[in-house]
């Protein structure tokens, strides 16, 4: 089974590099002006790269496969990283691709050269947008794939019985809002702040915290020992960055004589 799988992978790689070298051989002179895709056109280009051939694109994703042939490096990248969907292929020279590994987040600026068509391990057809990279950045989820498009600095601290909760800031990024919270416990007992159960209300609609395993956020604050501090990130999908919202976090103490109320913040 492993031998068949390896042969299938080799066949895919050979087909991929054949397509790359063919496209390189068919290169034309550079246009006087680069025409970039609008953000709203990316989904369509991922489905039909041939219709956008010759245009330029700035796109980010997560690398899931890397292959090399001489000085040429080809990377298969997920655009929709949470669902491992909408792949595209980036090819460039090994110098530009230096430092890229599987699971790296990359942002690519380059020229669309068409669509690659091949088979996956199960014999099903795959199609992928092909991009000849001119520049390539490597980084983390929140600075390369989903950087903050706007930030609300809050810096509000609330205190109950020696437990202080600070809402530091709210970042609005592609498809999500990230709420940065810190807790300091000087109550004399362990306190628990359940950020995983945090809720937001905006325009009468309730939003639940949603995990993002791809981002690697340190999400839940949970138990905070007496004398300790912790930080966490609460993630919501669907919040309007142009409107305020109310954030509620449950809190408890191991000292039954201390009754902690929910920590509630109003973000304008």
Regions found by a protein language model. Give the residues of each.
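The feature marks short-to-medium sequence segments in extracytoplasmic or secretory-pathway proteins
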Residues: 72-95, 171-174, 184-236, 240, ...
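Bacterial N-terminal signal peptides that target proteins for export
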Residues: 3-13
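Terminal connector regions
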Residues: 125-130, 134-135, 139-148, 241-268
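C-terminal motif of bacterial Sec signal peptides marking the signal peptidase cleavage site
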Residues: 22-25
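Short, surface-exposed binding/anchoring microloops in extracellular/periplasmic proteins
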Residues: 55-60, 64-65, 163-197
